[in-house]
Amino acid sequence: MSSSSEPVDDYLSSILGNIAGKKIAIISEVQELVEKTEHADLFQKVLAYCQKHGACVTTNHVEKYTSILPVYYTIAMAEASSTMNRFDGIRYTGTMAGESFLDIVKRTRSNLLGREVKRRIMIGNFVLSHEHYASYYLKAKQLASEIKQEFLKILNENDLILMPTTYGEAFTIGSKVSDPVSMYIEDIFTVTANILGVPAMSVPIAKGSNGLPLGLQLISRPFGEREIYNMADFLSHFGGEA
């Protein structure tokens, strides 16, 4: 873990109560996905609301955005499998009795690790294997770097990027346990900040058809938290009007 010595703003004083003159970026590739979701009308209303109060909305392209989810999960699974290697029942976590070291590790990891953790270890080991390292992991790292550069260029020219938090409203606990791919797809917008390594915030903006929250995500450049807090405060007054 590392930290920066760069001074940060007084975030409370950053909340100005208005967004006049702010440049809000939207991503056309995200827009195409939004049009297929429950967010479509709401997203347009939020953009109109921001423009009504003096913000400038710009449309931008990230050519490789459609690759962002597999890129993220390839890297995340690899990192997870590497990290989880330490949980062998000897040095970390609980332990299960066994006749040998390998038996202890096998029993411990089989019985104490959850299904999702096991899934990530298996996929991570696959993409890090000698046969697939270059075609999966290294390719994902290269694409992540290219996607990051495209986004940072946009953030250098705008104050914020605005996009939904998920495809739809919040889902109930356990509703997607049997369909992990469906759950992963819900991350398609939030993984952006992970790939970029920049600050982001999700704010509830309305309720969906089942009465559960719909969220919008605010993304800014490195150390751009003041823009996020100001916009989040502004959107807290959004009442659904255009």
Where are these predicted regions, by residue range?
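Conserved Sensor-2/SRH helix of P-loop NTPases
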Residues: M84, L162, G211
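Short, hinge-like loop/turn segments at secondary-structure boundaries
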Residues: T74-A78, P180-V181, I219-S220
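Serine-dependent amide/ester hydrolase catalytic core
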Residues: I19, Y65, D88-I195
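General small-molecule cofactor/ligand-binding pocket signal
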Residues: C56-H61, M201
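Amphipathic alpha-helical segments in well-structured domains
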Residues: A40-Q44, M77, E186-F189, A232
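A short glycine-threonine-serine/GTX helix/turn-capping micro-motif
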Residues: L12-S13, L33, V71, K106-L112
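Structural helix-boundary/capping segments
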Residues: M1-V34, Q44-H53, R119-Q149, E157, ...
